[in-house]
From Swiss-Prot:
SUPFAM superfamilies: MetI-like. It comes from Chlorella vulgaris. This is Probable sulfate transport system permease protein cysT. Keywords: Chloroplast, Membrane, Plastid, Sulfate transport, Transmembrane, Transmembrane helix, Transport. Its main location: plastid.
Length: 266
């Protein structure tokens, strides 16, 4: 009799997972398979689409990398130091989660535009942020910013100070302690945060459509290209591009996870 509650619980979880995630993906590919394969291939390999794929992956990778570096620094400061306004800063980290992405894009465009507070300063040196790839990168960094911090924070908080003190007592310098004691403990969480940040940036739409020019071969990303295809009633094109992005995301995440597994087995 004890098996039945477990079976019911597992069945509910499987059904939830299937209807929420698996079924929509299966339906997407079934709709694509109903069309002529030459047309599907033409849509998938269109030069504009290929350019959008490459730019999306490139900018998402850069955004995750930037967030990993600065996210680690911010997490270290929040967990290791006490200062006035620390609680406010800690709460503000989650702001991108709550803020609608279109509002985020509008805010970034206002601040970093040619007439904005920061954008006008860069404009004096002939450097434009909005309506360029830099704007796309900035939007991706903003929306994926909290993931690295929230992944690293619990690990740093639970790390025992005695490990560092033991390393210092054995004559290790601060850098050696960080490299040989602290960093190996943080690597799994850092990789997880990088992966989550990359995944979030890869699918961003709302803020990018507000801050970029959305022109092909310039700063057009895959999510905006899908929206443009839907506006033109090109449902096949939107479905194919969406499927390609899905496969790219899946392949990239599997690659990152495989690298993570191999690294921590050694």
């Amino acid at each position: 009799m004890k098996r039945y509650p477990t079976f019911i619980k597992n069945s509910i979880l499987l059904f939830y997972f299937f209807f929420l995630l698996i079924l929509p993906v299966v339906v997407l590919f079934l709709l694509i398979f109903q069309n002529n394969w030459h047309e599907v291939l033409r849509k998938a390999t269109d030069p504009i689409a290929v350019s959008a794929y490459l730019l999306t992956v490139q900018m998402a990778f850069y955004a995750a990398l930037v967030n990993s570096i600065f996210g680690f620094i911010i997490t270290w400061v929040l967990t290791r130091y006490q200062f006035w306004g620390r609680e406010f800063l800690d709460a503000a980290v989650d702001l991108p989660f709550a803020l609608p992405t279109s509002v985020a894009g509008l805010t970034l465009a206002t601040v970093y535009g040619d007439q904005g507070w920061i954008g006008s300063l860069f404009n004096l040196f002939g450097f434009q942020i909005v309506f360029t790839k830099i704007g796309v990168l900035l939007a991706m960094i903003f929306v994926s910013f909290p993931f690295v911090i929230r992944t690293l924070q619990p690990v740093l908080q639970e790390m025992e100070k005695s490990l560092e003190e033991a390393a210092w007592s054995l004559g290790a310098s601060s850098w050696e302690t960080f490299r040989k004691v602290i960093l190996p403990t943080l690597w799994p969480a850092l990789f997880t945060g990088f992966t989550l940040s990359f995944s979030r940036a890869l699918g961003e739409f709302g803020s990018i459509v507000m801050i970029s020019s959305n022109l092909p071969f310039k700063d057009l990303v895959a999510s905006v290209l899908i929206y443009q295809s839907l506006e033109q009633y090109d449902y096949l094109g939107a479905s194919v591009i969406g499927a390609v992005v899905l496969l790219i995301a899946l392949f990239t995440l599997l690659l990152i996870n495989a690298f993570q597994i191999m690294k921590f087995r050694v």
